[in-house]
């Protein structure tokens, strides 16, 4: 594992302010990554505070285990299983804040052996947990054109998804796509229009990565389970990096911040009325990175921080 990778956490200051950190509070970092946000929380909480962290990437867990602090604990798991983690630690209904920093980390992107980057040549893997599921190479080889087309279109919003899907399967008739630059070359040849501002492989790599890791389903489950863990007044802060992620977060917060409407005069029992009362969240803010941060950390450009609070 490359320990020299430079990592700058996105909107670190804004995240800490949005979580409204309490000195004796209990917090969960659902996406530890390289620990930038976690370390900021540890610096802010007091002696009685606690920080629990989760990451599906064993390399991130290795980094987390180097933190020798009695207030901190990390496990190797998916953040969709945050409820199980909270049950085990007896903190359901006691958590003051939860954060998710979605997408890939610098640890994954900058390591060519992980296969996430279209700018670095390495094995075409893309798994956030290299010990679970199948690699991108294996999935592309086994999948049919329609499946690949669906993934590229829906998870990458790729304009030339059909052309790229056909090109991939044509190549796979001869051999597997073993490395990232092989896939980049296939995409470049299948893409008729060149955009000097955007790499032609960007959306395809995003789509395959999202599908391989079931990222959107992870987000949905993680958000729903977070509501069962927070204490009243507890906050949920999420940083997303593209429209698919942000749409899920936005819709989730909108869903749980609206009051249910019942047509006037409609007979309804008290029990039924209680099930309709889903107004659990108060939306706190939506924050974008400053121009200064974008200049310092270009990765922050597309990020959005949304925060909501569980109602008292």
UniProtKB/Swiss-Prot annotation:
Enzyme class per UniProt: transferase
What superkingdom heads the lineage? Bacteria
Protein localization: Cytoplasm
Give any single GO term for biological process.
Answer: rRNA base methylation
**Which residues make up the binding site for S-adenosyl-L-methionine?**
35-37, 55, 79, 101, 108
Report which reactions are catalysed by this protein: cytidine(1402) in 16S rRNA + S-adenosyl-L-methionine = N(4)-methylcytidine(1402) in 16S rRNA + S-adenosyl-L-homocysteine + H(+)
Output the Gene Ontology cellular-component terms: cytoplasm
Work out whether the entry's keyword set contains Nucleotidyltransferase. Answer: no
Question: What are the entry keywords?
Answer: Cytoplasm, Methyltransferase, rRNA processing, S-adenosyl-L-methionine, Transferase
GO molecular function list: rRNA (cytosine-N4-)-methyltransferase activity
EC number(s) given by UniProt: 2.1.1.199
The record's section on PANTHER family has: 12S RRNA N4-METHYLCYTIDINE METHYLTRANSFERASE (PTHR11265:SF0), S-ADENOSYL-METHYLTRANSFERASE MRAW (PTHR11265)
What HAMAP family has UniProt attached to this entry?
A: 16SrRNA_methyltr_H
| NCBIfam families linked | 16S rRNA (cytosine(1402)-N(4))-methyltransferase RsmH
Of which family is this protein a member?
Belongs to the methyltransferase superfamily. RsmH family.
Please describe what this protein does. Specifically methylates the N4 position of cytidine in position 1402 (C1402) of 16S rRNA.
State the protein's name: Ribosomal RNA small subunit methyltransferase H
- Which organism is the protein's source? Buchnera aphidicola subsp. Schizaphis graminum (strain Sg)
Name of the gene encoding the protein in the UniProt record:
rsmH
């Amino acid at each position: 594992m490359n320990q020299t990778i430079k990592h700058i956490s996105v909107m670190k200051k804004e995240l800490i302010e949005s979580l409204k950190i309490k000195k004796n509070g209990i917090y969960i970092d659902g996406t530890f990554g390289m620990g930038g946000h976690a370390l900021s929380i540890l610096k802010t909480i007091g002696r009685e505070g606690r920080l629990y962290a989760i990451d599906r990437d064993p390399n991130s867990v290795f980094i987390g285990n180097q933190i020798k602090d009695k207030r901190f604990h990390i496990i190797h798991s998916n953040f969709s299983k945050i409820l199980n983690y909270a049950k085990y630690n007896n903190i359901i209904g006691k958590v003051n804040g939860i954060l998710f920093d979605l997408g890939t980390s610098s640890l994954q992107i900058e390591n060519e052996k992980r296969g996430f980057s279209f700018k670095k040549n390495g094995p075409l893997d893309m798994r956030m947990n290299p010990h679970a599921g199948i690699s991108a190479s294996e999935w592309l080889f086994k999948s049919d054109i329609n499946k690949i087309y669906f993934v590229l279109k829906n998870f990458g919003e790729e304009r030339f998804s059909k052309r790229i899907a056909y090109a991939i399967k044509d190549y796979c008739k001869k051999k597997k796509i073993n490395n990232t630059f092989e896939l980049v070359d296939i995409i470049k040849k299948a893409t008729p229009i060149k955009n000097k501002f955007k790499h032609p492989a960007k959306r395809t790599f995003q789509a395959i990565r999202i599908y391989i890791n079931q990222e959107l389903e992870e987000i949905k489950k993680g958000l729903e389970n977070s509501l069962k863990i927070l204490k009243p007044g507890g906050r949920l802060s999420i940083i997303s990096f593209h429209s698919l992620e942000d749409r899920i977060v936005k819709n989730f917060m909108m869903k749980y911040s609206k009051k249910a409407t019942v047509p006037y005069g409609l007979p309804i029992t008290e029990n039924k009325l209680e099930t309709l009362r889903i107004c659990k969240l108060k939306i706190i803010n939506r924050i974008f990175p400053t121009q200064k941060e974008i200049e310092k950390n270009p990765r922050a450009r597309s990020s959005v921080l949304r925060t909501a609070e569980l109602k008292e």
